[in-house]
Design a protein with these regions (language model features):
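Short, hydrophobic alpha-helix immediately C-terminal to the catalytic nucleophile
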Residues: 46, 86, 110-114
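A catalytic-pocket lid/entrance helix-loop region that shapes and gates access to the active site
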Residues: 135-154
Length: 193
């Protein structure tokens, strides 16, 4: 079976790991895709999904390595996210979909659309990254830094420092939401997962 149900959603079995998603409402399908930073998850879309579900079938997805999805020890690339998005639309949604994506997830959505135009109706890009940011080419120092971060003790230490409750609170206040009262406990918990 391709999908597993849990109390809060479903799991889609993809080749590199299980991908968590939610499905609510009925009507035309809409897929909501969160940013690709390490703490991101579909929980970012909770309030929007609730409103859209009144007239649509709304899917939120936790991309591989994020939220309640598996976090395999693999190299995460934009093209991997293209493959996930394409497979998810084909296997789970099963028909053309409207998509909304934020920040770093916008590039894989654009590429998925370029490769499989028949899967997407409308695409909404929220705060997309600039082409200038996307044109960076890895060099030898990038590979060295990646190898250091991939060392279990060092990588785990850095991740734990970056995703501590204090750092996540600062991230929310500085980057995402200027009014602290809008930050739900569920959203914070999703970032800690």
């Amino acid at each position: 079976e391709m999908c597993i149900r849990d109390s809060n959603g479903h799991y889609y079995k993809w080749k590199e790991g299980n991908i968590f998603y939610t499905k609510t409402g009925t009507g035309k399908p809409i897929l909501l895709i969160h940013d690709t930073d390490s703490g991101a998850s579909g929980e970012e879309w909770a309030k929007v999904a609730k409103k859209l579900a009144k007239n649509n079938t709304v899917y939120t997805i936790d991309l591989l390595g994020c939220g309640r999805s598996d976090k395999p020890s693999i190299q995460y690339t934009s093209y991997m996210y293209v493959q996930i998005i394409t497979a998810f639309v084909n296997d789970v949604i099963g028909k053309p979909v409207n998509v909304a994506a934020t920040n770093l997830s916008t590039a894989p959505v654009i590429m998925a659309n370029a490769l499989s135009k028949d899967l997407f109706n409308k695409i909404i890009l929220i705060n997309p990254v600039s082409l200038q940011q996307l044109k960076c080419i890895p060099d030898k120092s990038t590979k060295f830094k990646q190898n250091i971060i991939n060392l279990p003790i060092i990588g785990t230490f850095i991740y734990n420092k970056l995703m501590s409750p204090i750092k996540v609170d600062l991230l929310f206040r500085n980057k995402f939401i200027s009014r602290g009262q809008l930050i739900s406990d569920n959203m914070k918990d999703a970032y800690y997962e």
